[in-house]
A protein has these predicted regions:
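Glycine-centered flexibility sites
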Residues: 1, 17, 53-54, 86, ...
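Short hydrophobic/charged patches on amphipathic alpha-helices used for structural packing
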Residues: 1-2, 189
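ALDH superfamily catalytic-core signature
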Residues: 6-12, 19-160, 182, 232, ...
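Conserved C-terminal structural/oligomerization subdomain of aldehyde/semialdehyde dehydrogenase
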Residues: 9, 75-79, 96, 103-117, ...
């Protein structure tokens, strides 16, 4: 890596990794790196862009959820944490829930069960087992499952390592904030902006009734979220999978302070001076999503009973393979068997 990044025929460096790796490339290592950083004398003298992950929030806006809504969205959040065993740069890590939501405990119960019942996965990424062991030692009474390889941990706002250290492992923090409605949304955005490290991706779950009630107030609050990709009723990884959208940290990273990186990739439309991308999805799966077709509803319709990327999807592997073949050049006729398998998820 050092040889390639400093080679005379390399004009620009881009990496995906950790802030530690970024610092090693830009400033070097050891005491010399400390001196260089203090003097603003980078070892790397060519432009660099980077995507470095971070701690991604999942903001759960309180509303009149049905029992089916609670179960589905709990699986949604579990997917954000457990997909690829938690080894994702934009895995959900801190769930922000209203302390005053009447359905708070029901939702958290569904979330613990969803985390515990998802298919077992090995924690394989280098260093993740060590971080998991450290969390287990610090929180032996948390809701552990999968043989001690997963946890749901209630933490105090503004005072926990889960807020400032990307775990890259199946550990999910839960923070309770006061308020409901617009007051809660404002408080949750302030908390995410001020206390969670990184600006790569933020997820927001809100039912159509509450979104319609909050109207433009909700949209204006989204504008204050300092994240490169915001997903409303979706996972920010969908933004990563959409080539037309930019993917990277919220603008403002520097060589000396880039917790989620500098610059963007993808952006197939080559748009300039972008702050963020916003991805929107359906709050409910098919057929319950058909309720979103009512007049004046801000909800979105879905034709999928279970999205194929959910960790609970029974046909996720075959559907993902079929969609990949379709995007690589397959025709609509070849897509039909894949859609049929998706309906059976």
């Amino acid at each position: 890596g050092a040889y390639l990044s400093r080679h005379e025929r390399i004009d620009h460096v881009h990496i995906t990794g950790s802030e530690r790796t970024f610092d090693a490339i830009v400033w070097g290592s050891g005491d010399d790196a400390v001196r260089r950083k203090a003097a603003d004398e980078p070892l790397l003298t060519k432009p660099i862009t980077a995507e470095l992950g971070g701690v991604s929030p999942v903001i759960v806006v309180p509303g009149p959820w049905t029992e089916a809504d609670l179960a589905f969205q709990a699986e949604h959040v579990a997917t954000m944490r457990l997909q690829n065993a938690g080894h994702n740069c934009v895995a959900g890590q801190v769930v922000v829930v209203s302390r005053d939501w009447p359905q708070r405990e029901a939702f958290l119960g569904h979330l613990r069960r969803a985390m515990a019942s998802a298919p077992s996965r090995e924690v394989w990424y280098p260093g993740s087992s060590d971080r998991l062991s450290a969390v287990r030692a610090a929180h032996p009474d948390a809701a552990w499952s999968d043989g001690g390889r997963r946890a749901v941990i209630e933490i105090d706002a503004g005072d926990h390592d889960l807020e400032v250290v990307e775990q890259f492992a199946p550990v999910l923090g839960v923070v309770l904030l006061p308020g409901t409605g617009q007051a809660f949304v404002d408080a949750a955005v302030d908390y995410a902006n001020e206390h969670l490290i990184g600006t790569l991706g933020a997820n927001v779950l809100i039912d159509p009734v509450e979104q319609t009630r909050l109207a433009d107030g909700f949209e204006h609050t989204l504008e204050r979220l300092r994240y490169g990709t915001i997903a409303v009723n979706a996972w920010t990884a969908i933004g990563f999978l959409t080539p037309a959208l930019p993917w990277g940290a919220y603008p403002g990273g520097t060589l000396s302070d880039a917790p989620s990186g500098i610059g963007v990739v993808h952006n197939a439309l080559l748009l300039d001076r972008l702050d963020r991308a916003v991805v929107r999805g359906p709050f409910r799966p098919f057929p319950r999503s058909l309720l979103s077709l009512r007049p004046n509803s801000r909800g979105r319709c879905s034709l999928l009973p279970t999205p194929p990327w959910f960790v609970t999807a029974r046909t996720g592997a075959s559907v993902s393979a079929g969609l990949t073949r379709y995007r690589a050049g397959g025709g609509l006729r070849a897509l039909i068997p894949t859609l049929w398998r998706a309906f059976r998820a």
